[in-house]
């Protein structure tokens, strides 16, 4: 199957156009004539009473996780030449949860320093949208295990990662430097085509996501003088139960305790606690994510 679209991933500002996946339903007919067949009348035919409800026929489709914290489809860029703190902040380009919510990375404001919190939008994709997305994945051959050739002539690029859970299986597709400086062919072209179609046909006009928890990484800063813009130093709230010294890798923090603080902060807002200054990397906790 050949490539359908050309797509060059943008890591921080994915081009996700407004729109929605549309499910096409085909119908099949029977061309065989029944004119020559004898008509048989069944004896004592039973006709259901008027108040009997005919059984509902469930349309066939893909089985998938249905929990609010379970992931059906995820598209992300991982790795590449990024500092650990910057990599920690990154969220998937697209994520669909089992209950039909669609999460996308929204536009990022082009200022420095940027906001502390990533811009994640959420909308309702629904079951029809999930089925259409899984059908698109099947069309591109992604409901099976695949290995992808690696182009080592490109340095420090990210992996394009697509994870799909359907029909009791979970598939991870990982391709290095997908779509960068080359015309993709074969399986790489199919993966590229799926990413392009999914991210262009799913809407990004959702509402700002309000998480129950943020995932936080705190890095001590010994010298605050080496930045192009002078950092803002803020005292960490005394009433907070979080010890920043314990957040060197990752800690989940209830959102309602830090919402206002994080919303007003940028990436050069540093926090002090117990005479130590910390720089925070923060992302909202999405379905399937955690420390």
What are these regions (language model features)?
Residues 117-124, 181:
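Second-shell loop/turn segments in exported
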Residues 2-16:
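Bacterial N-terminal signal peptides that target proteins for export
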Residues 102-103, 112, 122-135, 139-140:
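A low-complexity, Ser/Thr/Gly/Pro-enriched, surface-exposed linker/loop concept
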Residues 17-22:
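Hydrophobic helical h-region of N-terminal Sec-dependent signal peptides
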Residues 101, 106-120, 175:
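Acidic/histidine-rich, surface-exposed loop or edge segments in extracytoplasmic proteins
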Residues 23-27:
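C-terminal motif of bacterial Sec signal peptides marking the signal peptidase cleavage site
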Residues 29-30, 40, 44-82, 86, ...:
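Short, well-ordered, aromatic-rich surface patches in folded extracellular/luminal domains
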Residues 86-107:
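Short, flexible N-terminal segments of the mature chain
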